[in-house]
Regions:
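Proprotein-processing/basic-patch segments
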Residues: 149-183
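Cysteine-clustered segments with highest specificity for TGF-beta superfamily mature ligands
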Residues: 128-131, 135-153
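N-terminal leader/pro-regions and domain N-caps
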Residues: 1-52
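Short beta-strands within extracellular/lumenal beta-sheet-rich domains
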Residues: 50-65
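Extracellular carbohydrate recognition and processing domains
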Residues: 101-135
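A short beta-strand element within beta-rich, extracytoplasmic domains
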Residues: 69-80
Length: 183
């Protein structure tokens, strides 16, 4: 095998994008959780109400191969289920991000709206504002709260919105860190 053909990112010259994926089926319900119910046929996912704020909690740890200090681009994959409504859904991400051996700072809230495509069961991807990675290191951890803000005037989608996953796009130049536990 020619070096750099199978793993061209190991050349370290051109940043590549990777996904840090969080499956919402593993999210922890809050005191006002969405309903885990039928999405399509025998498939189930979390369905978020159109009339209230419902949320799930999760965590995510930055990989060792991440380009330190580069921005992180969070987004959600979601679906309108069987609805053909074209109203907008407001998704909110509250997070606190800390390095190993650092205290978690006060949380930050970012939100965004996206119109449903009007196509039943379509998978949609909605980005949030990028998050600065300045000062963050490998193994830093996000503690997160995902909400659909169904009671907000900007949320005009009248059906339930199904949450599939939250992803954080990040850049890599290598396959990982040299140290197992980077300082």
């Amino acid at each position: 095998m020619t070096e750099g053909v199978l793993w061209p990112e190991l050349n370290g010259d051109v940043p590549r994008w990777q996904d840090l994926r969080v499956s919402l089926s593993s999210g922890r319900p809050s005191t006002n959780p969405p309903t885990f119910g039928t999405f399509r046929n025998g498939l189930e996912m979390w369905s978020f109400s159109a009339s209230q704020v419902q949320n799930l909690y999760f965590e995510a740890q930055m990989p060792h191969g991440w380009v330190l200090g580069s921005e992180i681009r969070p987004h959600i994959h979601w679906s309108p289920g069987n609805s053909t409504n074209t109203g907008a859904v407001m998704w909110e991400l509250e997070y606190s991000w800390a390095n190993v051996n650092d205290p978690f700072p006060a949380s930050t809230i970012i939100n965004s709206t996206q119109a449903a495509a009007g196509v039943a069961y379509q998978q949609q991807l909605m980005p949030w504002t990028p998050i600065s990675g300045t000062g963050k290191r490998e193994s830093s951890v996000f503690v997160c709260n995902l909400s659909r803000v169904g009671n907000n005037a900007a949320d005009t989608f009248t059906g339930v919105a199904f949450g599939i996953s939250v992803d954080f796009h990040y850049q890599v130049l290598t396959g990982g860190s040299i140290e197992e536990f980077p300082a």
